[in-house]
Amino acid sequence: MQKFYRLSVNIVKILTLLLAVFLFIGSFLTTCYAENMETQQVLLRFDNPLWNLLELAGYGLLFACCLSLSGKAGVKFRRGLLVFTLGLILLLGGMLIVFGRTVPAADALSVYNAAAEWILGNKDIIHPTFSYLSYYPQQIGLMAFLELLLRLWNLTGLSVPAWHFVKLVYVCLLCVAVLFQYRSLRYLWPDDWEPVSCCYLILVCCNLPMILYSSFVYGEIPSFAMLSVGLFLLLKLLADCIPAHSVETTSPDDTRVVGTSHALSAVTVFTALGSILFLTLSVMLRKNSLILIIAVLLVLFFEALRPGRSGRACIGLMAMAVCLTITSVGVLPLVQKCYEKKAGNTLSSGVTAMSYFAMGMQESSRGYGWYNGFNIDTYDAAGMNSDAANAISRAAINERIAYFREHPGYAVNFYLHKHLSQWADGTYASRQATLATYGGRSDFLKEVYEGSLASAYIEWGNAWQNVLYLGMLLFCIATVRKRRPGNGSANAAANDDFRFRNLCLYT
């Protein structure tokens, strides 16, 4: 079992290292961005490596100054930096609400309107053919969350649009995410968490796209917050509640015995349940979070196999994995059933996953593999029949595969540009996501979105992303190069593996 554990962990390390190499090289040598906010076409440019090195050196100097101050002032500096970071998020997030005037648009507007109409008593929101939710039933969880916020806002009796209140809640949730990620660092770097936490807070302060996303009335920010809390509780569970390290105990005859502590207490159970709850909520708010759930399940699997785990702890971790799988897969259907029962109607199965896969192999006006409407057009053409939609999608996939085989150079170019457009955009499409407004946006922010400051914002995001990818790459290299210790250092090796897996999960 230990050999299988080592083999599995090493495979994950190598694959993560390869991913880090691709991400850093792509981001360091190129930048993807959008200039025209109407077409939102993704453009590609090659960067000046010397300029990028200068930006990395600037961040290095910033980190060095931060660590120097941390060494002199100690805990006061770290706490002050945390307060400053959270205050900065609240300040900038509030300014975006007042001066940015972003409004929901596209899918975000459809879900927002669905929640508002439901509150007004419109039961046609739940309908097998006429409803937006019959195309995208996975949005039912976000609709439930927005319904709660809108009902709270309606209690105030104010005439201000409710989406401004939603954005304020999102700013607070962003602070929650940062706070719990900050607290998670103590479990990831128990020996060096103070300097690491300072560097983390510096990165958060410089992460302008994340703050800009607080005005995006969609599922990203609340799901991100739930994930951060759930992962913190998971790390706490693994590190505190069911640790895998040797401890000395005293037997009845006063003989010192080396064993492993695996006490199953109420704290352990509630920590596990809390982690499952928040991770499940993240899926309810944004179905894409299932990707992170898969990563969590892999972590639980590896932790169950970790040397030093007792049979009881192993069973507990596997039971947690089973529970998390059930709740994550079942939460959206459960919410959907609740709404269907209240409405006395049903929703269709929705746009098929295979149509998304087919769309990812096609061109669009924005870029290779981006949204072009194929999924919803196919669902309509199939008469909202999932089997027929899948048949059309399979035919489209086979057609593209045949074309790629006939034109291998085009295939390489297609997937290279698709990869870069998704992973070499340091703004993370934050301007496009928060572009919509009904007027009142300040002149300064207009320049950021479509004017002279847009290029500066793009460059800022690119520099930040280079730092992130470089840090990930260096950590992966250091972890892979570390030699396997002898049997006497098995716990040290397991701790390194624990840190690596969970850092990959956070990344």
Where are these regions (language model features)?
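Extracytosolic helix-loop segments that constitute the early lumenal/periplasmic catalytic or substrate-binding loops
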Residues: 109-134, 141, 367-373
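Transmembrane-helix signature of polytopic, membrane-embedded enzymes
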Residues: 181-206, 486-493
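Multi-pass, polyprenyl lipid-linked donor-dependent membrane glycosyltransferases
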Residues: 166-173, 199-234, 282-292, 507
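Short hydrophobic/aromatic helix or loop-helix immediately within or flanking a transmembrane segment
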Residues: 113-114, 131-159
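Start-transfer (signal-anchor) and selected internal transmembrane alpha helices
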Residues: 1-95, 314-322
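Membrane-interface anchor segments at the N-terminal boundary of transmembrane helices
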Residues: 24, 42-57, 161-170, 418-496, ...
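Membrane-proximal stem/loop segments at transmembrane-domain junctions that anchor or position
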Residues: 337-440
